[in-house]
Every structure is written in structure tokens, then in C-alpha cells.
A protein has these predicted regions:
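Alpha-helical scaffold/interaction cores of sigma-54-like transcription cofactors
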Residues: 1-606
Length: 606
């Protein structure tokens, strides 16, 4: 039987350095307690919206997509929770969150103007915020009843029938001061109540590791009295515990179920979405790809396959396997629905080459495509080197094609700028990545927070085997490293260091930007995914990481900046100044002098 309560304010590990609740933990806690639904309401972001939706759906728990955000009016600001009721509400949530993050300056908090929210909130429910810094709750805690009335009136007018006065009981004095004020105004204005628990960790005994995590995120020490902290009550309570906590206000518990029943939206996975490729000849994508590929192949055959003195019969014999392979590949590409992808990639590579921007010859499985060779995406003859197209695209293994494309590091931004101009600045974005607390970093950060001697912590951290390709966890190291086990047994402080580190190991610590990946949409990207701003880049960044942005339907294009190409271009330019002309593409791959130079071991790289 479903539990009679739903958590509507849950911070996952995507609330960076604010929560220890991994999505798997939320799934287990809600499912294990038979809670019919659960909301994710991360701080000013929707990083985990799609992943959360899929994981909860797998567990048979209804996902509710939400957001804890700061809203502002002429009197100040405060936090509220927004929940998506419908697809329109989810899209509005993405819009508001994207714009708040893209507009933020410096170290300011992202915020949404109430005026803007009032004009665009179809399909959203609003919870009025807690007593600590809530838009309504904080004013109630300070006894500012006029401001409470004013703000509640504005919210009810903006969200007719979709506002709930939020009550929280974490044992804080501000909550006890705010509650009678909130109850009075809610009853007087006939606004429904709802009980929430601001969930930040799994169980009460996780309060210490959570405190340490907060200190890591804020650069504080555990012993500091004025540091941010949460109470032991900020854990993921069971439905029974919540019902007992609010036994005197049962409607506040019942309304969690009412809200869950009103919410039917979730972030959806989509098939790949690409912008339409506009052919100058007015052809459809399949016909345009066939035209460009056949014309390009003939140029390649004349430049690389046919030799002087070949008669017509010899040329036809040499060309036959290439033309046959081209037709086969075009059939697969069209069958799988990817002609537009090849045309888009070919377009920006041809643009770069026309402007003497060095482009790599091709690497990875994409080098096995004759179509890619014909379009000048790659410069390697797949038949000459026996490369297989099926490693790149295979109808039996449906996945997006993925060319690894290298550009001169100094001029990569020019190519990205061209793509932005061609498809629209609001339709192109970089992809987010998340840095996590791996074993050694976790130990060092926890040691700093606990104010342990650096030399001692460093010695312990170095007992974790270093393997960047497959990082070793603390638990794995304890199985193999006797010295680490000995320190844990014999030194109580080291034991505490290791135990806390194990509990926060793997949690996300910060967000950054994927080094090469870009997505290009067929519409403004905020209509498809929430967006984020990396302070180090002027370009928008998707809030979903590479795996989940592709599941959301966006296609990744790699724009890798390769320093080697820059060095080669400069070398060719320096030689030209001395009257020596070199074409890198015509240097034979079996050049003896090149191998002699490489064998001497005097090169930086190959």
C-alpha cells in the first residue's frame, strides 16, 4: 500500500557540495518506504532532472521535477520551490532557470524576478519557502505580517489555485516563530498548507559527513562556529515520521499527495534532434548527401586513386569498389536517419579548410567511412588501409555517429563562431561536466576541514594507488593496502578521516565544461534542455552532461583543439618564408627520413 506522504523538497548530490543524496539513494529511500512519488528540488539548477526522471521511473516511483530558486520583488528576495505539473510547466521551469543562470554576474546568486515569473508560469505549482530564507517564510519568522500578506497576495494572483504555504519542522527557532504567522494567513486567505522536510542526507547519522561536505564547498573548517550548517533533522524521513511530526496538521501531509497527483510532468528522453540542413540546390538531405558524396568521391579518385597512364577500363576497375562502398554506406546512413549529421559536419569542416584552418586527417572509427572521405570530413582512404565502416555505423547497433574532429588550437574558436552564426547563438551550446570527489581528493579535503596536519593527511592519501584511467576507491584500497588498514585501526583520527571520506567520496564537487563537445539544436536550446553558464566561457552550457544531453535528443559534435596542428601550420609557414614549399598531405607515409627522425627519439610527440 502506498505511503500517505510525498517528499516535495529533496536536494540531490546535484546541489553541488550541499547534499549527500545520490539519485540511487533517493530511489531506494522513496521506494523502500512505498512513497508513491518524490520531487527533486536542487538549488538553482536542474542538472539531474532527466537522470532523476529515468531512475525513478525504473523504480516505480513517480518523479516530480522541481527547483529551489530565489525570486525577487521590490522589497527583497527569498527562496521558493517550483514544481512542474505538466509539460508546459517543465518547459517554463527550464526557461526561468536557464535565464537566471545565464544572466547572473560574477559571484551573485541566480534569481528570477517575480514580475517575470508572474507572466510565465503555466503548469507550475509554487511552495512559499522555508522560514530560514524563504520568500514568505523568512518574513513570517521576523513578524513582518504586512510583507507576508503582500507577498502571498502577489503569489496567489500570479499562481491562481497553485500556491501552497510551506511548513517545515527541523527544530529551528525561526520555524517555531514563523509557523503561527503562516497558519493564520493561510487560514485567513484560504491557501492550502503543505509539509516539507528539506532533505539533504540519508539518515541522522549522516549529519557529520554532510557538515564536512558543506565545509568543503564553502572553504570552511568544521570547528568554526559561524559556518553554514543543517540540523540532524534534515534527513530523508519516512512517511510515518512525517505524519507523526505533523500529526496536529494532517492536511499538510495529505496535500503532499494532492500535489503529487496534480503533477504529471517528467523530463523525457527523445530521439536525436538535428537542425535541418539547407541545400543551396534546394534538395532534401538524402539527395544533397548523395550529390555531395558522389561529386567528392570523383575528386578523391582522380587525386588519390587513379594514376597516370591508366586507361578507362583500369580506372573503372579501380573505382568500382569505392563506388560500391559509397552506395552501401549511403544506404545505411539514410536508413538510420543520419544524412543531416554528415552534411552538418562536412559543412563546417569544408568552411574551415577553405580558410586555411588546419583540420586533422581523421581518427577513430569515423576514418572507416568512404562517405566521410568523399565529403572531406576525413583525409584517409578507408579502402587503401582496410578500414571498416561498420565500426562507425551499424544498423544492428543503433547509436549516433561521432566524428572526433581536430582543429588547430589557435583557430578552433573561429569554426565554433561560424557554427553559432549559421545555426543561431541560442541553438548552440557546450556540454557540462561534473568534477567529483575521488579518493585522494576526498581525503585531503576532509583532512583540511578537520584541521589535521597536512603531512599526515598527505601520507594517508598517497596510500591510495594512483590509477587515473580507473580510479581506485578508498574501499578498494583498504582491501589491498595493509598499511592503510593499520593506520585506520591504530589512529582514531585517521579512522574518522577515512570513514567520513568514504561517505562523501564520489559526490559531485563542481561543474565545468566539456573540452570539445558542442550540441546544435533545431530550436532555441532552452526549449529542449535547461542551460547553465560557465563563468569562464561566454557560450551557454547544457545542464545535462554528455550522456544525458544525448538522451534528451541533442547531438554532440566534437571540436577538439589540437596543438600539434598549430605547430605543423607554423612550421609550414616558417619554411615558406625560406622559399621551401611543403604540402603535408603529400608527404608519403613510408618516408624513410621521417622514420629515422622518429627513431632518434628527439621528437616531442608523433
Amino acid at each position: 500500500m502506498p505511503a500517505p506522504f510525498v517528499h516535495l523538497r529533496v536536494h540531490s548530490a546535484y546541489s553541488l557540495a550541499e547534499s549527500t543524496l545520490r539519485l540511487k539513494s533517493i530511489m531506494a529511500l522513496a521506494g523502500g518506504d512505498s512513497q508513491p512519488a518524490v520531487a527533486i528540488t536542487d538549488t538553482s539548477n536542474m542538472f539531474g532532472a532527466l537522470e532523476f526522471s529515468e531512475k525513478m521511473r525504473e523504480a516505480g516511483v513517480q518523479p516530480i521535477i522541481g527547483l529551489e530558486c530565489i525570486i525577487a520583488d521590490s522589497r527583497g528576495r527569498g527562496e521558493v520551490v517550483l514544481l512542474a505539473q505538466s509539460e508546459a510547466g517543465y518547459e517554463a521551469l527550464c526557461r526561468h532557470n536557464s535565464r537566471a543562470l545565464l544572466d547572473v554576474e560574477g559571484g551573485d546568486d541566480p534569481m528570477i524576478q517575480l514580475e517575470s515569473l508572474a507572466q510565465d508560469n503555466e503548469g507550475m505549482i509554487l511552495l512559499t519557502g522555508g522560514a530560514v530564507n524563504g520568500f514568505v517564510g523568512a518574513a513570517a519568522a521576523e513578524g513582518q505580517t504586512a510583507l507576508v500578506d503582500e507577498r502571498l497576495s502577489a503569489l496567489v494572483q500570479a499562481f491562481p489555485g497553485r500556491v501552497y504555504v510551506e511548513l517545515q519542522r527541523h527544530g529551528l527557532d525561526v520555524e517555531r516563530r514563523a509557523e503561527p504567522v503562516l497558519l493564520n494567513v493561510a487560514v485567513a486567505a484560504d491557501i492550502p498548507l503543505v509539509a516539507t522536510n528539506d532533505c539533504r542526507f540519508e539518515k541522522r547519522d549522516m549529519v557529520m559527513p554532510h557538515d564536512v561536505l558543506l565545509c568543503i564547498g564553502n572553504g570552511r573548517k568544521l570547528a568554526e562556529d559561524d559556518r553554514p550548517r543543517f540540523t540532524p533533522e534534515h534527513y530523508f524521513k519516512t512517511a510515518e515520521e512525517m505524519a507523526s511530526l505533523f500529526a496536529d496538521i494532517p492536511e499538510a501531509i495529505r496535500n503532499t499527495l494532492v500535489i503529487a497527483q496534480r503533477c504529471s510532468a517528467m523530463a523525457e528522453m527523445r530521439k536525436p534532434i538535428l537542425p535541418p540542413f539547407e541545400s543551396e540546390a534546394g534538395l532534401g538531405e538524402e539527395d544533397e548527401l548523395q550529390r555531395q558524396a558522389k561529386e567528392g568521391l570523383e575528386e578523391r579518385l582522380h587525386g588519390h586513386v587513379f594514376s597516370e597512364g591508366m586507361d578507362e577500363a583500369a580506372r573503372e576497375a579501380a573505382a568500382a569498389p569505392y563506388r560500391e562502398r559509397l552506395e552501401f554506406e549511403l544506404g545505411v546512413i539514410n536508413q538510420m536517419g543520419f544524412p543531416g549529421y554528415f552534411l552538418i559536419v562536412a559543412d563546417f569542416i569544408q568552411w574551415a579548410k577553405a580558410r586555411d584552418i588546419p583540420v586533422g586527417p581523421g581518427r577513430g572509427s569515423g576514418a572507416g567511412s568512404v562517405v566521410a572521405w568523399a565529403l572531406s570530413i576525413t583525409d584517409l582512404d578507408p579502402l587503401r588501409w582496410g578500414l571498416l565502416f561498420e565500426r562507425f555505423l551499424n544498423p544492428e547497433r543503433v547509436s549516433m555517429p561521432d566524428f572526433d574532429i581536430d582543429f588547430c588550437q589557435d583557430r578552433r574558436e573561429e569554426v565554433i563562431g561560424y557554427v553559432q552564426e549559421k545555426y543561431g547563438f541560442d541553438k548552440v551550446a557546450q556540454i557540462i561536466t561534473f568534477g567529483s570527489l575521488q579518493a585522494r581528493a576526498a581525503l585531503r579535503d576532509v583532512g583540511r576541514v578537520l584541521e589535521m596536519p597536512y603531512s599526515q593527511v598527505d601520507r594517508i592519501a598517497k596510500l591510495i594507488p594512483s590509477n587515473p584511467a580507473n580510479p581506485v576507491t578508498i574501499a578498494q584500497a583498504l582491501e589491498t593496502e595493509e598499511e592503510l588498514r593499520k593506520h585506520r585501526r591504530e589512529d582514531e583520527q585517521v579512522g574518522e578521516l577515512i570513514d567520513i571520506s568514504m561517505k562523501i567520496e564520489g559526490l559531485y564537487r563542481h561543474a565545468s565544461t566539456h573540452a570539445a563537445g558542442l550540441v546544435i539544436g533545431d530550436r532555441p536550446l532552452e526549449q529542449l534542455v535547461p542551460l547553465y553558464r560557465d563563468p569562464r566561457s561566454p557560450m551557454p552550457v547544457t545542464q545535462f552532461n554528455m550522456k544525458w544531453v544525448e538522451n534528451a535528443g541533442l547531438v554532440k559534435f566534437d571540436f577538439l583543439g589540437l596543438k600539434t596542428l598549430t605547430v605543423l601550420q607554423r612550421a609550414v609557414a616558417f619554411l615558406a618564408q625560406r622559399g621551401v614549399e611543403i604540402d603535408l598531405e603529400t608527404i608519403p607515409l613510408d618516408d624513410a627520413k621521417t622514420f629515422e627522425m622518429l627513431s632518434a627519439g628527439d621528437t616531442v610527440g608523433v
